[in-house]
Each structure stands twice: as structure tokens, then as C-alpha cells.
A protein has these predicted regions:
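Bacterial N-terminal signal peptides that target proteins for export
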Residues: 1-11
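Glycan-recognition and catalytic cores of secretory/periplasmic carbohydrate-active enzymes
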Residues: 24-218
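Bacterial N-terminal signal peptides
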Residues: 11-19
Length: 218
């Protein structure tokens, strides 16, 4: 579907932009499978994808996850934010080169997962502080988005393990999540978003993980 840009189509474009926020939801019954925007806005979108999304040094985003020595900063949010944008871009243009970039980015990130499930860059004694859980949220969202696009079960498993590990640290009898991080735990508590997405994707299973995620939500 080719959409020429006009002022009267602004509401349609806004709806398209907002629809990416629901990318991690299950199911899409829309008969529209792809939209192509032309004109000035279409050119700007293409330029953004070519010269910003595809040009990103992905290894630079992954590198912090290879070193668990952070105490306070938020580098761990960037990979998850970038890959969600890259996946939305791929859904728009179906560029096979971009797909490979995304695939490589996901596999590089998953390779940093520790045996206990942690994916992040905070030193063990500083985990749960500052922006650590916030970064885990974006990591999980990015892995889920890749799973939704590719069907790669390794990504879903990696995201589940991230949450599994977090639940060994927070919850009843452990650290109260609202006491972690900044702003009375609001950034940390937003990890509930990927937790709910994981529940939606694993609730048909009867294993311990699904029950633990359900209990965490409740």
C-alpha cells in the first residue's frame, strides 16, 4: 500500500507510528500487511533507516554487556531500544540486509548471558541499583521483539532466563522492587512490561517458569 503524504493523512501516519508501540503484543489480525509511505516523510523515513538504524555500530552497543563492572550508568538500555527500532524498520521495508544486522545483534547479545541468566553490565554488588533493572527491561523487550519477528526460541528462552534471574533477587522474602534503582523504583517496576509479554507467550506451557511469572504478576 503506497501512501502519499498530505496534511490530511497526518492522523493515519500518527496511527502507524503509534502502532509500533504494540509491536510486542501477541496476534495481529489486520488485513494490511505492509505500508509504504512516499513523499517527503517517506524519504525521511528511508534516510533514517539507511543512515541511522543500519549504520549503528551494534558491537558498540553489545560491548558493555561483556563486562560486569558498572556502578551507576545506563548503557544497558541502548541495545534494547535500538533493536526494537530496527525491527520496526524491518517490518516497514523488509530489507534482508537489515534483517541480518538484527539477527547478528540478537545473537551477539545472547552470547553475553551469564550462566545464572543475567544479561547486563552491573557488577554483582551493584545489581538492582541505579539503572540495572531498567536495562534488563529493555534487554528483555528486545529479545522478545526478535522472537516475535524470527521465531527464534533461543531469544524467548534468554528473555525468560533474564526474568528468572531477576526473580531470585526481588519479590517476597527478597528485595522489594520499589526500593531498587531510581525514582522510588518506578524505572525498575516497568520491567513488568516484558514479564507480561513473556507470560502471554508461555502461558500454554505448564512448567515452573510460567507459574513463577504468573505469580510475579499477581
Amino acid at each position: 500500500m503506497m501512501i502519499p503524504f498530505k496534511v490530511k493523512t497526518f492522523s493515519f501516519l500518527l496511527a502507524c507510528a503509534c502502532s509500533t508501540a504494540g509491536m510486542a503484543q501477541v496476534g495481529n489480525d489486520s488485513p494490511v500487511k505492509q505500508v509504504k509511505i512516499s513523499g517527503y516523510v517517506g524519504t525521511r523515513i528511508t534516510d533514517c533507516i539507511e543512515h541511522r538504524v543500519k549504520a549503528q555500530d551494534v558491537d558498540h552497543l553489545v560491548e558493555p554487556f561483556r563486562h560486569q563492572n558498572e556502578k551507576s550508568r545506563w548503557q544497558s538500555e541502548f541495545w534494547g531500544k535500538w533493536i526494537q527500532g530496527a525491527i520496526a524498520s524491518y517490518r516497514y521495508n523488509r530489507d534482508p540486509e537489515l534483517y541480518q544486522i538484527i539477527k547478528d545483534a540478537a545473537e551477539s547479545l545472547m552470547a553475553t548471558q551469564l550462566p545464572n541468566g543475567y544479561i547486563g553490565n552491573y557488577a554483582p554488588e551493584y545489581q538492582l541499583q541505579q539503572w540495572d533493572v531498567w536495562g534488563r527491561k529493555y534487554t528483555s523487550l528486545g529479545l522478545i521483539a526478535w522472537y516475535d519477528l524470527s521465531g527464534d526460541k533461543k531469544a524467548l528462552e534468554a528473555a525468560c532466563r533474564v526474568v528468572d534471574h531477576l526473580m531470585t533477587q526481588v519479590g517476597p522474602g527478597k528485595v522489594d522492587i520499589v526500593s531498587t534503582g531510581n525514582y522510588i523504583g518506578m524505572p525498575s517496576s516497568s520491567v513488568l512490561e516484558p514479564v507480561m509479554y513473556l507470560y502471554n507467550r508461555t502461558k500454554e506451557n505448564t512448567g515452573h517458569r510460567t507459574k513463577r511469572i504468573k505469580r510475579y504478576i499477581e
